């Protein structure tokens, strides 16, 4: 069972039931369970070792999958497959992630401007330059 605590901790906090799986020496999951309705297979792409062709095979077998490409930032997502990426493992940022999905969000999100937290860096990008003269 080789996964980041942040995954299991979040599932526990959100009261999401989960099972873990082992991996083989090629970092492929050892998982032969049939998924029930409403269950998802969380496929961790360790070190980018699983190709998109292999991901398509998992998608065909399990239908509902989420691909964790946190360690494969530069691997394109498989079309129609929910895929997560992290920024902080590859770039000098404290946090941040990207979700690729074709699902539609049925709620309105608040618009956030980052310049109040990063005025010296982003202010001139998001507003006029004159607002940030010292």
Predicted regions and their residues:
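PLP-dependent aminotransferase-like
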Residues: 1-73
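Active-site region of PLP-dependent enzymes
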Residues: 74-134
């Amino acid at each position: 069972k080789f996964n980041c605590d942040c995954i299991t901790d979040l599932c526990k906090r959100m009261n999401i039931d989960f099972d873990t799986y082992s991996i083989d020496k090629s970092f492929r999951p050892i998982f032969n369970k049939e998924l029930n309705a409403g269950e998802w297979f969380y496929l961790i792409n360790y070190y980018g070792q699983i190709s998109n062709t292999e991901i398509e095979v998992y998608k065909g077998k399990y239908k509902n999958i989420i691909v964790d490409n946190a360690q494969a930032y530069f691997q394109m997502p498989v079309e129609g497959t929910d895929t997560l990426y992290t920024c902080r493992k590859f770039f000098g940022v404290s946090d941040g992630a990207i979700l690729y999905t074709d699902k539609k969000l049925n709620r309105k999100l608040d618009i956030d401007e980052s310049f109040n937290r990063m005025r010296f860096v982003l202010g001139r990008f998001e507003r006029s330059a004159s607002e940030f003269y010292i």
